């Protein structure tokens, strides 16, 4: 029988040459959620996710994957169940787009017709038309297209969990936003479990179903974006969020208005514009030129109401922060 928890950390510690990298780390990661670990460089985030696929062994404590201790798995069997996305996604240059995406399913001897359908569906989902992109080689792709294909390759394997270690930190803001949307789109369709590592609280709030804040190898707080923002239990957690508020107010994603409580329940009867949580305050102001209210589609795919008054209040509060 499947349990709600896919990965469980029990009092994990990791030392390097008598120096503690991780201390007393305990956490349950639920099936089907995007769990984001956020913290500064050196806080232990990458060490934690490397323990999941056996690249790093804990000094103390136990890790359970799908109900079994990690150490009891054959390493190859374990890693076939785990996808890994790093900053630099390298496609095989002598393989077409379709061959790159189909790599792991082919290694698993999945039926070819099923693989072909999967490849076409995934390409379609990320706005890469199969008949145009299937047979293209990596050197015929733009940088953003290569990133999308690399991410599809990981999800095509249908792993039980996908580990994403600062995958977008080296990208320009436009590419970064596009790939964040891609992750949310794929997650909505496949309901994969994702553990995402970042140092950017904005990114954490945008992507995470739950967020874990780390500092100096310790887990300070775990909660939903709303819980982290509205009820920080540590000065460092509060400071981390406040730093994410220092940017151009018009470039703020609408999901931040959700986590801060500026959105309201939808009325029974609503006819008007709809924006996605990945859109910005600037886009909301543009939409308000012809409307008094907006529907905002949140990450869980529910609609919430944004009024003109609440948007003005947010901008005022933001500038006075």
Protein language model regions, located:
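Helix-to-loop junction immediately C-terminal to a conserved catalytic motif
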Residues: 53
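Conserved ABC transporter NBD signature motif
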Residues: 61-69, 78
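Conserved ABC ATPase "signature" region
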Residues: 113-132
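Conserved ABC ATPase signature
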Residues: 137-141, 145
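Conserved catalytic motifs of ABC-family nucleotide-binding domains
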Residues: 158
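Conserved ABC ATPase "signature" C-loop
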Residues: 216-217
């Amino acid at each position: 029988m499947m349990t709600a928890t896919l990965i469980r950390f029990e009092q994990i510690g990791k030392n390097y040459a008598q120096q503690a990298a991780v201390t007393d780390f305990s956490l349950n990661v639920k099936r089907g959620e995007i769990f984001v670990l956020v913290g500064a460089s050196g806080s232990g985030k990458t060490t934690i996710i490397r323990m999941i696929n056996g690249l790093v062994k804990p000094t103390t404590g136990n890790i359970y994957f799908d109900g079994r201790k990690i150490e009891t798995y054959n390493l190859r069997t374990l890693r076939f169940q785990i996808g890994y996305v790093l900053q630099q996604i390298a496609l095989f240059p002598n393989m077409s787009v379709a061959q790159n995406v189909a790599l792991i399913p082919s290694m698993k001897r999945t039926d070819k017709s099923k693989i072909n359908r999967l490849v076409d569906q995934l390409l379609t989902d990320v706005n890469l038309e199969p008949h145009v992109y299937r047979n293209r080689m990596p050197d015929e792709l733009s940088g953003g297209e290569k990133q999308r294909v690399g991410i599809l390759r990981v999800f095509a394997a249908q792993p039980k969990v996908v580990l994403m270690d600062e995958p977008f930190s080296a990208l320009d803001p436009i590419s970064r936003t596009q790939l964040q949307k891609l992750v949310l789109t794929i997650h909505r369709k496949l309901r994969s479990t994702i553990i995402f590592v970042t140092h950017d609280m904005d990114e954490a709030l945008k992507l995470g179903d739950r967020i874990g804040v780390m500092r100096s190898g310790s887990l300070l707080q775990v909660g939903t974006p709303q819980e982290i923002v509205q009820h920080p239990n540590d000065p460092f957690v509060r400071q981390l969020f406040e730093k994410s508020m220092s940017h151009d107010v018009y470039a703020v994603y609408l999901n931040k208005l959700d986590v801060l409580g500026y959105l309201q329940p939808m009325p029974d009867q609503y006819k008007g514009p709809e924006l996605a949580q990945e859109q910005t305050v600037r886009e909301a102001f543009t939409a308000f030129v012809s409307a008094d209210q907006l529907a905002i589609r949140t990450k869980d795919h529910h609609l919430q109401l944004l009024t003109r008054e609440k948007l003005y209040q947010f901008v005022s509060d933001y500038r006075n922060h």
